[in-house]
Amino acid sequence: MARFFKPQKRKITDTKHKEIVINRLDHLGAGIGHLNNKSIFVDGLLPGEKALVQITDDKKQYARAKVIKRLIDSPARIKPHCPIYDQCGGCNLQHLSHQGQVLAKQQALSDLMVKFAGDQQVAVDKQRAGDQQRALFEQVTPIIAAEHHYRRCARFSVLLGKDGQLQFGLRKKQSKDIVNVKQCPVLAESLNELLPPLRSLLSTLKGQRHLGHIELIEADNGRVVLIRHLKPFSDKDMTLILNFAQEQNVILFLAPTSDDIELIHGETPYYRLDDLTLHFSPKDFIQVNRDVNKKMVEQATDWLDLQPSDRVLDLFCGLGNFSLPLAKHAKAVVGVEGIDEMVHRATENAMCNKQNNATFYQANLDEDVTKLAWAREPFNKILLDPARAGAAGVMEHVVKLKPERVVYVSCNPATLARDSQVLLKKGYQLERLGMLDMFPQTGHLESMALFVKAKAVKKKRVVTKL
């Protein structure tokens, strides 16, 4: 049968400038307003602001727009601290006061949880409280620290331009182009001090064209520099690089491939946490905010209400950032991670800190982990700290273990809200919810939620107001 071509109708986006008033921020820091009963997302606008905008992406349920002109500014709007804020893609909330950022993120987190998990939460509440009116959950005071110079990890892009000049900096907003960075207001001060000599080194290398990107880390035993390169350095370039490492007293790694790194100068980096020493590789994930990480681990320990007889399961455990501090208060902690190398690192860290009650295993966390050998003994407390994609694959298996308490640490409130529904449908109560100010000046939102089995919920509840 012959098939006839039927051209699809071209969707025409209305590009006329429209006036909009912003009501709130979403969980990524974009302003939300409404036109013709449709939600419009606009980067760079704050609640209460009025602006002329132009639609850039028109969907059936929502649209995105860009600012043409601000007409009314919010009292919370401030001058960005960074001179290249309008160009750099690293931060997107420097135009909002730090207090305003914290309040907006806390509200966005609460709104998401009420929207996506509220129905199940209300059902559990009514069943347990005899239809009495009460708060859905305790919204605790956000964990905050310094608003500037908090970031102990950063990745810088390097490119030899057509004009022969070396570009060294961060990616521009919504672009692969590089904006040159001399100083960064969210980068740790010790790493900012390293930028001028590092730029000078890179500019003198003959192999500039073969540079990949540069990673900087502030470890507790020194500054770490990782140089990725596509071809081997010449002997002359290697001499310059080693001289730089010695003069600046940095821990230097070279990475000829995405998988291989080589320690060239200095010792294995580590950071201290709760009187523990955690060694890591530049390839490993560590939390970027040292102070918030410390408070976050303390809060997780408190929320789990650890007892000497507890057996704790730490899923997505990484190199032991939660597992090892938790092991100081529990009978046993089992950490599970999908990456072999991280499991090896966590095991070494447990041995280094003489924590014999912490053991680590590699497993695919999308599969039924309850069938694995280490899950034969029961766990009464569970902690999860997944990546942005969340823990959809493991949630059904978490409830099979029937823990008394579950602490979920999230870097994406949307997946936290989604995954929470599994626990709520199985009779767990969302007891506490808190925002962790891990990434000031950006729209990234870290959070922590506590779920408790219905029979373990205490009758007295205190709701913390911001």
Curated annotation (Swiss-Prot):
PROSITE patterns for the chain: SAM_MT_RNA_M5U, TRAM, TRMA_1, TRMA_2
Q: Which reaction does it catalyse?
A: uridine(1939) in 23S rRNA + S-adenosyl-L-methionine = 5-methyluridine(1939) in 23S rRNA + S-adenosyl-L-homocysteine + H(+)
Q: What class of enzyme is it?
A: transferase
- EC number(s) per entry: 2.1.1.190
Domain annotation TRAM: ranges:
11-69
UniProt: S-adenosyl-L-methionine binding residues: 287, 316, 321, 337, 364, 385
Q: Where does [4Fe-4S] cluster bind?
A: 82, 88, 91, 184
Q: What does this protein do?
A: Catalyzes the formation of 5-methyl-uridine at position 1939 (m5U1939) in 23S rRNA.
Q: Which family does it belong to?
A: Belongs to the class I-like SAM-binding methyltransferase superfamily. RNA M5U methyltransferase family. RlmD subfamily.
- What name is this protein filed under? 23S rRNA (uracil(1939)-C(5))-methyltransferase RlmD
